[in-house]
């Protein structure tokens, strides 16, 4: 399975103002480009850690997870420890930055890593 998680920095970050995150997620769902799609308010918070624990509880089903949000380097720094804790193969993780993009720009950036 291939999944898309869009992290929106609580939904109040000015860097997401030009984008309709629902249109982004629905584009990938409607066009069958991913097997599942999720909008998470803040993956770097403690409930984000819990989200990863639940999602990766069935990690053998996951071929690729794309997280669209902040800088990929920051994502690896924030999620790396939980991936290690759960024994998740980090080569299946791809981070893509979509801050300060329009809806169309975000879709293109995500398509480039899928």
Region spans (language model):
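Iron-sulfur-associated redox domains of electron-transfer enzymes in respiratory
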Residues: 1-114
């Amino acid at each position: 399975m291939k999944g898309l998680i869009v992290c929106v920095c609580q939904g109040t970050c000015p860097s997401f103002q030009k984008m309709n995150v629902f249109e982004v997620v629905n584009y990938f769902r409607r066009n069958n480009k991913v097997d599942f799609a999720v909008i998470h308010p803040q993956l770097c918070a403690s409930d984000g850690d819990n989200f990863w624990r639940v999602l990766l509880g069935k990690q053998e089903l996951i071929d690729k997870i794309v997280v669209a949000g902040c800088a990929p380097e920051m994502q690896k720094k924030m999620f790396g420890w939980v991936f290690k804790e759960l024994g998740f193969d980090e080569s299946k993780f791809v981070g893509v930055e979509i801050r300060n993009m329009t809806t169309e720009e975000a879709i293109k950036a995500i398509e480039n890593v899928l």
